[in-house]
């Protein structure tokens, strides 16, 4: 005992030094320091004498194994108290070192701790020593001492206790673990509110904002509402705000730590809180779709909805359009659509229809300036269908379709004066706007015509206002509708630029000027009815009634519907050498032609015949090997200078300067529909470009326009009377149905050397009996030749060679049959109408291009060799 008691002061000295450093708040807990220490220490050393958590429970063994509430203490917080000699064990900064339980990690500021507890905690942690158990009396089992040194209780020179388990306290940089779930799966915060948040208080230890410290959040010293925005409505409004059951809205929300801006509140509606969606509860529209965008700022959900709704019902903006007093509208009022400003405006009764049509046109992308047009000259002024469709340079009108230089029309000044249909803008606004809109719907370009290229003389539809005859009485509504329908399918225009096609300008094409071609001037061609009224319209100004003109306009539109190619022979110089030199030529009545290579059979029979002979001849012609029609020279729509498709030449009505077969010339209503139907089945896009519908050799070689016996070459022809005209028109239409080679080709060579040379339109070709009276004008007395009905029936089977081919096999009765696929060529002489086979189809081999160069068989291989397809 003496030795033991003698060793006590030395550890006491160390404890005194330690206590001076740690400044304990209250007595007790340190063995031998104050009453309640280790038995044998100072008086009062009853185990557990001081009633603080962690005090020894007797036998010098600390009872600090369990923390308050029976919870296991944290590491270094009394776990080793049972091994020490003093109550409280070794806890961290050391119960048993004179500190209360409150000095343990996790126990700071719990009642029972002193003001210096935190400092002691900090100092002990910084020292990195657990200040092992005091109990190591020399010779005893000193549980712990300073690491690497003799036990604290060991007397120098004595047997030191077992080296203390150093470092059991909170070492430098150690992290005090927290209670609760901590960080959950995936690194997400735990479900327990507050767990995982930094701070001295482990998350979840203090309920709510601190049961003992109202207003204190999870973060120590951070009351809700002071610098950290409150998370519940009304939060931060007092010391008890946010406490469960105390705050105005029921306290803390699940998963929302108070006082720390991590998650937004979960209550419906935020009442202005900065982390809400800005909407009030109960479905009331919010004050903005985003935080910070209230109503009236133009931003947010309301602004977006309003803008979308405005765009849905409002037209394009801009001054004077919808509404306003904008400039230039439809049809030229002060406003835009139409009238003064607004949609309804003060326009005509058809304003609504015009606006609707314009909108429909604009819907499909009409080019700018079309619908609506410029200031009052588009729909229905001088544009569509004013001066354009119909009107000057439009469809129909001067320079349009029909008109000067159009289809039909006269290349030069017509025989009837300007033919503007009723004056510009005469068509009702509703019909005009609707037609224009429909035309524009498929992409017609804007301007005076379709397309609009100015105001010139003759040429492409809409190119000019050159003098000429118009539709000749066709109703404006029908003309507008037909024009719109034609434009709907993109008619490329049936004529080339004014002057390019020979015959467009008077004098350019021999025969364009009246008198140059026999038959152009009334009386020059035998049998022609002098003074055919009307200039080459479709059907012309000489029709008996406007109804026929309307039908012609409709037919022309239908013809344009399927793409009557632009330009009837777009190669200048169409009629070159041999353009009917010498007029009718010798033997015009007898049918005996002159000139080498004309294809005339000497002794070709002309003159009058009998109906039976004509019928048999036509039947024989139809069954001929190459199915060449008798008299195809001047009977095919639009193939000659004189009798052609309406609107190709400078002639009266149609193709040339002369009166044509029904449907070809001026005023011949029957046949205009046939011409349209002929064009319907595939007139090539470039009707006579090089290699087009008769590039070189387009209208036949020598003897080109029908060769000998053109329209009267079959002997025994009967003079056609007026009743035969209707049959001729019908038959011609039927003939055209099966592909009479398109609408002629006025390309290079088309009317070139030999194209209309001596014999081509010479004696028999267009001579007496060829296009003489009786086969041309209904009611006229014929001079012979094949009756129109018979010739048309022969033509029904689709002769492709539009002219005689030298050396071809004739069919009985005279006349030279055309052989499909033979081109007029400097390489291979004797070309015919190569390029297009029977039925108007390109030949399979070489596509007709080489046929123009004279390669035989170009149109007579395979299916195109005259066999009727099933």
UniProtKB/Swiss-Prot annotation:
Chief localisation class: secreted
Post-translational modification 4-hydroxyproline, affected residues: 39, 75, 105, 207, 220, 223, 244, 338, 402, 408, 518, 539, 637, 646, 662, 670, 715, 842
PTM per Swiss-Prot/TrEMBL: Elastin is formed through the cross-linking of its soluble precursor tropoelastin. Cross-linking is initiated through the action of lysyl oxidase on exposed lysines to form allysine. Subsequent spontaneous condensation reactions with other allysine or unmodified lysine residues result in various bi-, tri-, and tetrafunctional cross-links. The most abundant cross-links in mature elastin fibers are lysinonorleucine, allysine aldol, desmosine, and isodesmosine.
Cysteine pairs bridged by disulfides in the record: 860-865
GO cellular component terms attached to this protein's record: elastic fiber; extracellular region; extracellular space
Stated induction or repression of this protein's expression: Down-regulated by DTR via activation of EGFR.
Name recorded for this polypeptide: Elastin
Source organism: Rattus norvegicus (Rat)
Gene name as annotated: Eln
